[in-house]
UniProtKB/Swiss-Prot annotation:
Part of the 30S ribosomal subunit. Contacts proteins S5 and S12. Keywords: Ribonucleoprotein, Ribosomal protein, RNA-binding, rRNA-binding. It comes from Yersinia enterocolitica serotype O:8 / biotype 1B (strain NCTC 13174 / 8081). One of the primary rRNA binding proteins, it binds directly to 16S rRNA central domain where it helps coordinate assembly of the platform of the 30S subunit. GO terms for biological process: translation. PANTHER family: 40S RIBOSOMAL PROTEIN S15A. One of its GO terms (molecular function) is structural constituent of ribosome. Belongs to the universal ribosomal protein uS8 family. The keyword rRNA-binding applies. HAMAP family: Ribosomal_uS8_B (MF_01302_B). This is Small ribosomal subunit protein uS8. The gene is rpsH. One of its GO terms (cellular component) is ribosome.
Length: 130
């Protein structure tokens, strides 16, 4: 059976892995998933990530914990295949009054809401992470 929303699957694997106190989670890789993982690493929500394999690449995310608790409190898919959500640069949301991040897909690549505001770009809101 084919996967309808691979990004939602990625976010669910992160959520489930942290609730089960897993060290790492694996999933099928894609360019968008690697870009999202890069943003999560830069913002300190995951330890590290790596892509392994040639024919069917696998993305492995090393999850991050602080004093035994998961760093990611909530991770929520916003734009989905059935309902895409696009925002202009002035309309970009602030997650938890700036404590969390919104992952935005822009014409210049995948970035946080703060980076998109600085660059003066709008785009598709992929997910919220707090």
């Amino acid at each position: 059976m084919s996967m309808q929303d691979p990004i939602a699957d990625m976010l669910t694997r992160i959520r489930n892995g942290q609730s089960a106190n897993k060290v790492a989670v694996t999933m099928p890789s894609s360019k968008l998933k690697v870009a999202i993982a890069n943003v999560l690493k830069e913002e300190g929500f995951i330890e590290d990530f790596k892509v392994e394999g040639d024919a069917k690449p696998v993305l492995e995310l090393a999850l991050k914990y602080f004093q035994g608790k998961a760093v990611v409190e909530s991770i929520q898919r916003i734009s989905r295949p059935g309902l895409r959500i696009y925002k202009k640069k002035d309309e970009l949301p602030k997650v938890m009054a700036g404590l969390g991040i919104a992952v935005i897909s822009t014409s210049k690549g995948v970035m946080t809401d703060r980076a998109a505001r600085q660059a003066g770009l709008g785009g598709e809101i992929i997910c919220y992470v707090a």
